[in-house]
Amino acid sequence: MLRECELSKRTTRAARSRPRAAVKRSHLRPVHRQPSPAQRDELARWDEFEDNLAVEVGKRNVGLQKRPPFDTARGYLKREVYRYICERLDQKAGVSLQWCIEEAREGRLPRRPSFRDNPFHWALLGLQNRPELNLKKGEISRFGRQLLYARRHKVPAHFLVGFIYQTGSPTLINRRVADDEREPWYGTLGN
């Protein structure tokens, strides 16, 4: 009896020490695929956007003088990501944009939120591998929810930073995004 117990312990340990078979999951980086012409165009557009953003954010990080929120590096980053993603979604380029971000992303892909739920979060994750942008994990989540909340209100990119500052704290915006709430004035504008 004792021998059987020892034997089963050994086989369990051996089974645990074996490498697991590769399982394809949606949150893991996809296997390299051959891009379609639309995806190649989107990837070139994304690379150009990423490079321009890194240069501009780097320029805005120079100097220690106080700036209004609109002119800070973080304000510029939010505004440009918002502008780019809204433009691509309005042109119905969501599928190729998602593929492009998956290709640009280093590491695991998020399970939540999905690209459909929050494309801004995914775009910020795609930019995370750029050291010039210095994006932290908490900022990605917070900025993604702020941009999604602004998109629900159809805020023009130029007014984005002001809208975020006027609507309240990040905690309040998080709650409103989770509850699918809108600002009280939104329904009165005929939207």
Annotated model-derived regions:
Residues 11-12, 72, 167, 171, ...:
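Residue-identity detector for threonine
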Residues 58-167:
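Short, Lys/Arg-enriched phosphate-binding patches
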